[in-house]
C-alpha cells in the first residue's frame, strides 16, 4: 500500500516537471542510435590500418555471393594456407566453386609437397597427362589404403609410379609425411627392417642432448607399448646413430654405443617412474645416478644428473 502511494506521488511529480513516457522512449532511442554511430566509427578506425585486406574480404562479385569470401581475390599465399587445412574430399568440393584455383598446378604442387614432402615422382620427368591435382588425390588414396593395410598402401604407391621399389625411397616418404597412422607404421617397420635402417639414418642428432634426441626419434618411429625385441632393436639403432652424429662428444664423455644403449633404457624406465600415477615412491635423483653408474661405468655423475633433470622437467622420452 505504501509503495503504491509512493509511485502515484512520484508520477505526479514527474508530470509536473514535464516528464512523459513518450518523451522518455524518444530520448532512449536517440541515445542508442548515437552509441551505434560511435561504435561504427571506432570500427572503421580500427580497420583503417589494414584497409586493403578489409576491402578484399568484403568484396563480392554479385549479391548472390554476399557472405561468401572468394579465395581467388585473396593473395595466393593466403589461399594456399586456407586450402591446406582441407582434406581431399573438401578440396574437390572447393574446386567446383573456385574454377581458376582448381586448375592452378602450382597450388596443387604446393599442397602435395607440403603434405607429402618426398615422393620418387617429384624427381622424374612427368608422364603424359600428369597433373599435381590428380597426384594429390592418388597420394590421399594411398595414405588411406596404408592406414588400413600398410603393404597394400605401399604397393598402391608403387603401382601409380609415385614411389620406387627401394627401401631408401620408402623411408624418405615415411620420414616426410604425417598422414600415416603410427600404429600401422609401427607394424610395417617391424616387418620391413631394411626400411627401418634407412629411416634411422635420415635422423640428424648432431649437438642434441640425449633425452631430446630420443624424444625426436620416438616422434618419428613410435615405441611399442610393451618391452620386447622390437624395442631393443629401436634403441640399438638409435644408439649407433646418436654416436655417429656426435663423435666428438662421445670421445669427450667416453661413451660407446653400448653405454648409450644403457642410458636410453635408464631414461625410459625413469620416464615411466616419474610420470606414472601408479608409482607412488618416485625415484630420487641420487638413486638414478647410483643405479645408472652401476650399470654403465665411467659415466660422469654430473652428466647423469643432467639426464635426470631433463626427464623431471620436460617429461617422458617416448610419450
UniProtKB/Swiss-Prot annotation:
Role according to the record: May promote guanine-nucleotide exchange on an ARF. Promotes the activation of ARF through replacement of GDP with GTP (Potential).
GO MF term list: guanyl-nucleotide exchange factor activity
Domain F-box: 68-111
Organism: Homo sapiens
GO biological process: regulation of ARF protein signal transduction; ubiquitin-dependent protein catabolic process
Disulphide-bridged cysteine pairs: none
Protein name per its UniProtKB record: F-box only protein 8
Positions of the SEC7 domain: 146-276
InterPro entries: F-box-like_dom_sf, F-box_dom, FBXO8_F-box, Sec7_C_sf, Sec7_dom, Sec7_dom_sf
GO cellular component term of the entry, any: ubiquitin ligase complex
Keywords, sorted A to Z: Guanine-nucleotide releasing factor
Amino acid at each position: 500500500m505504501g509503495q503504491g502511494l509512493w509511485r502515484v506521488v512520484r508520477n505526479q511529480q514527474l508530470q509536473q516537471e514535464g516528464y512523459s513516457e513518450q518523451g522518455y522512449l524518444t530520448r532512449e532511442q536517440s541515445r542508442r542510435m548515437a552509441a551505434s554511430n560511435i561504435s561504427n566509427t571506432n570500427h572503421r578506425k580500427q580497420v583503417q590500418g589494414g584497409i586493403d585486406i578489409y576491402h578484399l574480404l568484403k568484396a563480392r562479385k554479385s549479391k548472390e555471393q554476399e557472405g561468401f569470401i572468394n579465395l581467388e581475390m585473396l593473395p595466393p599465399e593466403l589461399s594456399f594456407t586456407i586450402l591446406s587445412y582441407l582434406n581431399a574430399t573438401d578440396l574437390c568440393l572447393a574446386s567446383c566453386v573456385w574454377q581458376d584455383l582448381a586448375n592452378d598446378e602450382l597450388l596443387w604442387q604446393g599442397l602435395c609437397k607440403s603434405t607429402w614432402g618426398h615422393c620418387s615422382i617429384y624427381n622424374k620427368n612427368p608422364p603424359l597427362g600428369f597433373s599435381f591435382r590428380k597426384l594429390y588425390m592418388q597420394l590421399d588414396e594411398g595414405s588411406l589404403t596404408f592406414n588400413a593395410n600398410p603393404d597394400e598402401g605401399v604397393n598402391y604407391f608403387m603401382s601409380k609410379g609415385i614411389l620406387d621399389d627401394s627401401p631408401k625411397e620408402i623411408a624418405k616418404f615415411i620420414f616426410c609425411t604425417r598422414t600415416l597412422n603410427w600404429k600401422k607404421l609401427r607394424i610395417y617397420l617391424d616387418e620391413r627392417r631394411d626400411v627401418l635402417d634407412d629411416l634411422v639414418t635420415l635422423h640428424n642428432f648432431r649437438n642434441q642432448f640425449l633425452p631430446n634426441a630420443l624424444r625426436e626419434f620416438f616422434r618419428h618411429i613410435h615405441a611399442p607399448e610393451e618391452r620386447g625385441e622390437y624395442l631393443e632393436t629401436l634403441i640399438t639403432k638409435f644408439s649407433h646413430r646418436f654416436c655417429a652424429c656426435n663423435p666428438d662428444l662421445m670421445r669427450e664423455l667416453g661413451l660407446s654405443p653400448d653405454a648409450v644403449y644403457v642410458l636410453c633404457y635408464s631414461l625410459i624406465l625413469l620416464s615411466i617412474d616419474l610420470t606414472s600415477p601408479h608409482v607412488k615412491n618416485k625415484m630420487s635423483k641420487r638413486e638414478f645416478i647410483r643405479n645408472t653408474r652401476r650399470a654403465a661405468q665411467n659415466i660422469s655423475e654430473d652428466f647423469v644428473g643432467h639426464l635426470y633433470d631433463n626427464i623431471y622437467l620436460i617429461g617422458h622420452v617416448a610419450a
